[in-house]
């Protein structure tokens, strides 16, 4: 019997457990905590069989390229976005994350990887899996090159249906 876990901003559906930020549940020896997001929904911290998995959902440092705003307006918006991003990540400060799924969204423009780089540098997940880049697969390799040598292994997806495996230790 499959159970789906989503944020509480979606309609009620069969086999769906809805969670809001701050809630925690246990299902089949799996602990799930819903955490804040900087966009709609929530992010999830999942602990199962000694593995700690973080799924950011739509949480990101939404530092959009400057639009038609003044430089001052852009800088204010940028500061607010960074503060919201750092606050949303605060609950993870003591976690040792094995695998993190995190947006690397080229729609943001040249700042597409700022959230990912901040996350990797501050939380050092053992494995980092970029998401939300659609089929712009080169984005991942660009991120990997920017990071240089990192404690985190970046899994770059190169095609739909690609499978990865990870063994702790």
Put a short name on every predicted segment.
Residues 14-96, 160-169:
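Core dinuclear metal-dependent hydrolase active-site scaffold
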Residues 1, 93-95, 119-124:
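Short, conserved loop/helix-junction motifs that constitute active-site signature segments
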Residues 2-12, 20-23:
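Short, polar loop motifs at secondary-structure junctions
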Residues 84-90, 109-118:
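A short, acidic, amphipathic alpha-helical segment used as a generic capping/interface helix at domain edges
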Residues 2-3, 14, 30, 51, ...:
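A structural micro-motif
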Residues 11-14, 40-42, 61-65, 106-112, ...:
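Active-site environment of divalent metal-dependent phosphoester hydrolases
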Residues 3-9, 54-57, 76-80, 99-105, ...:
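Active-site neighborhood of phospho(di)ester-bond hydrolases with catalytic His/Asp-centered motifs
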Residues 16-23, 112-169:
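Binuclear metal-ion centers of metallo-dependent hydrolases, dominated by the metallo-beta-lactamase
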